[in-house]
Swiss-Prot record:
Gene: TDC1
Protein EC: 4.2.3.17
Keywords, comma-separated and alphabetical: Lyase, Magnesium, Metal-binding, Taxol biosynthesis
Position of sequence motif DDXXD motif: 613-617
Cofactor: Mg(2+)
Catalytic activity of the protein: (2E,6E,10E)-geranylgeranyl diphosphate = taxa-4(5),11(12)-diene + diphosphate
This protein's name: Taxadiene synthase
Similarity comment: family membership: Belongs to the terpene synthase family.
Cofactor binding note: Binds 3 Mg(2+) ions per subunit.
Amino acid sequence: MAQLSFNAALKMNALGNKAIHDPTNCRAKSERQMMWVCSRSGRTRVKMSRGSGGPGPVVMMSSSTGTSKVVSETSSTIVDDIPRLSANYHGDLWHHNVIQTLETPFRESSTYQERADELVVKIKDMFNALGDGDISPSAYDTAWVARVATVSSDGSEKPRFPQALNWVLNNQLQDGSWGIESHFSLCDRLLNTVNSVIALSVWKTGHSQVEQGAEFIAENLRLLNEEDELSPDFEIIFPALLQKAKALGINLPYDLPFIKSLSTTREARLTDVSAAADNIPANMLNALEGLEEVIDWNKIMRFQSKDGSFLSSPASTACVLMNTGDEKCFTLLNNLLDKFGGCVPCMYSIDLLERLSLVDNIEHLGIGRHFKQEIKVALDYVYRHWSERGIGWGRDSLVPDLNTTALGLRTLRTHGYDVSSDVLNNFKDENGRFFSSAGQTHVELRSVVNLFRASDLAFPDEGAMDDARKFAEPYLRDALATKISTNTKLYKEIEYVVEYPWHMSIPRLEARSYIDSYDDDYVWQRKTLYRMPSLSNSKCLELAKLDFNIVQSLHQEELKLLTRWWKESGMADINFTRHRVAEVYFSSATFEPEYSATRIAFTKIGCLQVLFDDMADIFATLDELKSFTEGVKRWDTSLLHEIPECMQTCFKVWFKLMEEVNNDVVKVQGRDMLAHIRKPWELYFNCYVQEREWLEAGYIPTFEEYLKTYAISVGLGPCTLQPILLMGELVKDDVVEKVHYPSNMFELVSLSWRLTNDTKTYQAEKARGQQASGIACYMKDNPGATEEDAIKHICRVVDRALKEASFEYFKPSNDIPMGCKSFIFNLRLCVQIFYKFIDGYGIANEEIKDYIRKVYIDPIQV
């Protein structure tokens, strides 16, 4: 009978023992029982290894002969005398008893669900009320509107918008400044306060407010030099405001060195603008009110939007009105004052940005499934205004905005809209750098975050996406290292998106991270700070927390069922395998309550596949593997009398499960699908036999041969077909192969699984005699290539495969149920995260444990 080499056995056991005897690995020690015993003759020492699964057969490895024997724990009777390998994997971190003790009130009480239902209705109302944008008042912009003059009948000037002046008079804070009381940013407060003091001084009113405001400015102006960051275009706008304040006789410390330095910087930038008077840089239009002395007011009118605004900025629009008397500017500002009750925001309209941001916010929080119709309406609206030039904050924005465009590209593509990444080319300067590279402020940082996230969805050969990634990733990593912004929430988001890009971001893990860092009093910054109530929303946060906990309670019940099944089936007693119920369950990456049957079937089948993988790799002989495979092909349990009893038990458990799941499939699909179900299992075990024959012959296949076989033996075929047939959607016979094997998307996801796995397991497999891996096969095809060369090549192949899989996933296919496509496509996530640093299935480490704890074990505080 064919045997693995003695040296391979020793190497494998040496590798396994390293995990057990490593003094730094206390968990591994405590979860393994290792005993040295003597035979009755006193001549042979035997090492006995048992996993954490409990009672069951023990594999005994003789130190003198290298052979192993399966013995009964209770009688120590030798069952066979065949050399076998024993894989000393780390023990199960989520033992049956741990899972069974989980309790949560969110499953038992209807109060939580009733409150969640109420919140869903309220948030739907918020979607339905979306208009041109809901945004907080801006003292800075309102003061600009208050400064606009008109000529009265006696020839004297008076405020054209007295309601704006009254708002400035009545909204000074206790410390003498103007701004959002709950959030202090020095740049924001100074811009708001200086301009408010100017507005009051122009009309010679509010003398006490002017005095208090000037006192605040004088006290804080000296601190400006200590600021780590300045708001966008501060160096253009603020010196111009100080010049106006000085002309009005407002007593301030104008000669501070830092103020002089700001003025010098402004003069240099004005020189650049003057030299390009016929072509003012678009990114400087936002600071138009700081450029008064160099603007040609006739030529500037070509930048006016349909709604009458200039770059959606009331301040800039008021400045143009002051210098031109344009009626469209007047009408817009008058309408804004009516809408916002005597004040104006820092930008308007923001209908596109608000819709995209709300959808993005809802989906980040993990509650998007409650608002499918509302999301579609919002995105249909955005898509109607989508342009190859890009989009701005509002539908009438004349100048596209990188942040809104990148967010739109990502969100629209995610939902299946046809949008080209070439739109990003509009945001590069002559050096190929994106506009957001200028300024180094967190407004630009937000743009780069969305640029990076958009690049996650790259298709093959999309140069614009590749350029975006090359620019955005180092930019964000540098931002994390240098802390160029004080925005804590934004940094937490950057840490997550860089650490877990889209192809690695498990939906529930992302939701947990976003909820934990969510700030329902969050402010954004343009020239000044502002709030968007639809985004910084306590109702969204409350629903997200409740929904997460309610769904988690269902997941806990499913995990209890699954660990109980694993134990009662006897599989927990099999000691040659890894016990990974919680990890396999996590791998489904499908959390919606309606897919409970899918998750349960996937996990049961997946756990058995982990067992089969270990059985084929380290336990079964070639002949036993062939017998087992023949039983699978014939769908017959009577062919198993020549294989060990533990393998017979595994087969019977598998066979029973197949019958049970097929019965469930019949109920959903309305017909017997067994013929479809058997095919991937036959392919799967045939590949195991092929791999073992190559191993026994010492043959390393070519890279192409390797992929054809090993991409199947990774096991996605058998473990996904029945689950997708249980998703509640009818899958026609001819559609099965379009979504499952051998569809392009399925093969690409399988390829990414196989090769990503190889990069973290090949050394361990090589040590136990399994020479064939993607790394080894590439090196065989390319003499002289190093392991490092092979890994780099494999990473490129995986990157390409994921891009092609994305293209296949988003490609329109009306006959394929979207739920089925999503289930297959989302399986790419778990392999990327499980094999990010180590073999996350073979070594049940603390990082994986932390993922599972966050998603399934620990509820969110409500």
